[in-house]
Amino acid sequence: MVKDVSPDEVAAEMSKRKLLFVDCWAPWCNPCLALAPILDELDQKYADNEDVGFLKVNTQIHVQFAIDNNITGIPCVLLYVDGKPAQIEIEAEGNAEPFTLDRLIGLRPAEHYEFIISKVMGTETD
């Protein structure tokens, strides 16, 4: 199960992981509640991988964390790589310009998180 932590615990964990997912959620948010089992399953899957971690921060309790991280909607999963906010380059389809990703917003399937993990860990397949 993904551990619900304080912002201080997020800061401490960032330096320990190559890739850290931080789920910004609130107990009244139905999409947040629907995302929880997806992240719990991924957390279990990667439990033995010290490079990948999952945490969650209750934005109803830790309002300043949400403000500091420009959280304007939830669920919002912040991405940290090597202890810093992520800057993951994503190739867009068609003629669209590539873009940089630092968070996943909304209810997303496990495959989206798996894609980020493979991209950051260098295990992408074409």
Where are these regions (language model features)?
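Thiol-based oxidoreductase modules, predominantly thioredoxin-like and allied folds used
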Residues: 2-6, 24, 35-65
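CheY-like receiver
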Residues: 12-13, 65, 116
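A short glycine-leucine-enriched loop at secondary-structure breakpoints
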Residues: 68-72
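Beta-strand cores of modular interaction/reader domains in eukaryotic scaffold and signaling proteins
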Residues: 20, 53, 76-80
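Short cysteine clusters
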Residues: 29-32
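Short active-site neighborhood of thiol/selenol oxidoreductases, capturing the structured segment around
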Residues: 15-27
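N-terminal "domain-start" segment that seeds a small globular fold
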Residues: 1-12, 113
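Non-catalytic, surface beta->alpha helical segment in thiol-disulfide oxidoreductase systems
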Residues: 73, 79-126
